[in-house]
Amino acid sequence: MSSMETEKGAVPTPQAPPVAPTDNKYRVVDVILRVLLLAASIASVVLMVTSKQTEIIVSPFGSRPNAAKFQNSPAFIYLVAALSVAGLYSIITALVSLSYMRKPIVPPKLFWILLIHDVLLLGIVAAATGTAGGVGYIGLKGNTHVRWGKIRNVYDKFCRHVGASIIVSLFAAAVLVLLVFVNANSLYRRIPKY
């Protein structure tokens, strides 16, 4: 704009700060972490859903078969539901991230949306993992103060499946923590430096 236009009363319009291009390595790491989240979610759900074991229980009233399955515990059902949502979420967000891979500039709003949803899902998965871990620990060790006996010596296969599922879901929560760091860092790098 020339000085002549300014003198005639034309007010210069403020320009928005330039949007910094996103580093491609962050996009690749984001997609890889989302695929890892999908794999961990599927593996944990499969381990939990296949954790059924039937044993003959002897009691003073006779012996009968008794099945241990994940549906008997609300904590395990919550874990399966949370990880199913995490798996679906990882598919959707991986596709969104892949669609923005070829674009030179990614809108900051996308990073905000991903960051908020990643944090929300991290809370859900971490709560489900902790809840299932608490129930699993009582099944493993029992609680002598309230006379809850351990079940690991009777339902060993069931306990192994549940334990492996909880460990893999803990890995899924760690992947979500890394996704939060990656998206927060990507958003931070886009803040204009004055």
From Swiss-Prot:
Membrane topology: Multi-pass membrane protein
Main location: membrane
Subunit structure: Homodimer and heterodimers.
Cytoplasmic side: 1-27, 97-109, 183-194
Source organism of this protein record: Beta vulgaris subsp. maritima (Sea beet)
Protein name, UniProt field: CASP-like protein Ni6
Keywords: Cell membrane, Membrane, Transmembrane, Transmembrane helix
Classification lineage: Eukaryota, Viridiplantae, Streptophyta, Embryophyta, Tracheophyta
InterPro entries given in the database record: CASP/CASPL, CASP_dom, CASPL
